[in-house]
Amino acid sequence: MRKWYLATTLAFLLAGCSGEEGADNGGQTVGADRPVVFASNYPLQYFAERISTPLVDVRLPEFGDEDPAFWMPTSEDILALQQADLVLLNGASYESWLKNVSLPSTRLVVTSEDFKEQFIPQEEATTHSHGLDGEHEHSATAFTTWLDLTLAVKQVQAIRDVFSERWPEHKGQFQSQCGTLMQELEALDAEVKMIVEKDPSVPVVFSHPVYQYFAHRYGLNGRTVHWEPHEIPSDDMWQEFATLLGSHTAKWLIWEGEPSPDIIAKLESMSIQSVVFDPCAGKPDGGDFASVMRLNMVALKTVYGQQ
């Protein structure tokens, strides 16, 4: 009986230790000795992983199908954020959930802090619905900063600097891996400029107010509507769109995600083609930030007659 008890206790303890070593609220298997950093959106996670792999465990909250900009954390999410070594924030009004969460200020890293003067104000705050997510409001400040790839580079540098300060023993590796990432982003920046500069007067319409930094940096001649890829626009929205085309003769509508076939067909009846330029705020189903941006380059070349 005593032998059975000891064996059972030992097995239980070993199982507990094994589960604790690999536990991770994001479903990842990680070592218990790595520092944990949370990122408020996928671009920041990607940047941080590129800089710090394999030294830091960089995690995303469980957003599900929700846009990270309008995510509201559960009590479990808040606890995980409070226990993290650092929390990377986009800034520019991106994290509306911060108003309802108490986190140690010493662990918060606002990656856009050094270019606040370059924030783009929205013409007006707008409230609308994203399907099952319910109503939400776009703030008075545009927040998809990383679509200006020069600003993405600055966010990368901010992550590198705080990691180097927090874990100075790894500074050399952080700097080296950051340098490689910055070169890739700078090459993408140059490619976008080259594509658009061939004919910047081409009129386009953006499906959603998330392309402000992109349009500003690269000089796109764009106007914006508030449409969702899988929600058929109302009659009033179609009428507003037709009115817009009266003064802005666009032939392309640029979407965040693949629109429904019914929307595509209706647009084609108006001689409007659809193309997807994914901001990549959430983790893609396949590939990574770099591969999504490569697909975006293909889409952009199509719009500008280079494909």
Per-region residue spans from a language model:
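Positively charged n-region of N-terminal signal peptides that target proteins for export
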Residues: 1-4
